A protein has these predicted regions:
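Aliphatic-rich helix starts adjacent to a transmembrane/signal segment
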Residues: 32-51
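Flexible interhelical turns and helix-capping residues at alpha-helix boundaries
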Residues: 5, 38-41, 63
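Low-complexity, acidic interaction segments enriched in glycine
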Residues: 50, 54-137
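Short amphipathic alpha-helical interaction patches enriched in hydrophobic/aromatic residues
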Residues: 29-33, 37, 56, 60
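Alpha-helical hydrophobic helix detector
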Residues: 16-32
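N-terminal leader/signal peptides at the extreme start of proteins
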Residues: 1-10
């Protein structure tokens, strides 16, 4: 009686070798990809801080004073004359690439204001991906 099923397949050794090769490739490639994402987030944050700092300066030029908080760039604060905003289109643009709120400090360490991203962990300080990013650095 002829058999319709073939017993051809992979041996256990062949499967183990393939799994080991995939694991080695993942171990080599994954850190490189994760490092690129971290660099991209930091570069994106730097560009974002520069743009928002320009918006803060425009706010000052038009109103005669610096905003009390970054949200003032999006929504007109009460009692502010000559507000011609929004200077930033929407509130979500006031978050860093990690989804944390940006912080406006007045006065700043190196000027009348500074805008800070607290990095990946969203807390002051840190190293690497968690290091703070300031608009004047």
């Amino acid at each position: 009686m002829p058999s319709f099923y073939r017993n051809d397949g992979f041996t256990l050794i062949e499967l183990i070798v393939v799994i080991a090769l995939v694991a080695v490739l993942a171990a080599v490639v994954a850190p490189n990809l994760l490092g690129k994402a971290s660099d991209a987030n930091r570069k994106s944050a730097v560009i974002q801080l520069e743009k928002i700092a320009s918006s803060v300066e425009l706010y000052r030029l038009e109103t005669g004073r610096y905003p009390e908080q970054l949200e003032d760039l999006v929504k007109r604060p009460t009692g502010v004359e000559r507000w011609n905003g929004p200077y930033v289109r929407k509130l979500s643009l006031l978050k860093d690439p990690w989804g944390n709120d940006l912080v406006l400090r007045r006065p700043g360490e190196n000027g009348p204001f500074e805008i800070v991203s607290y990095g990946g962990d969203g807390r002051p300080g840190g190293e690497g991906d968690d290091a703070d990013i300031l608009n004047w650095e």
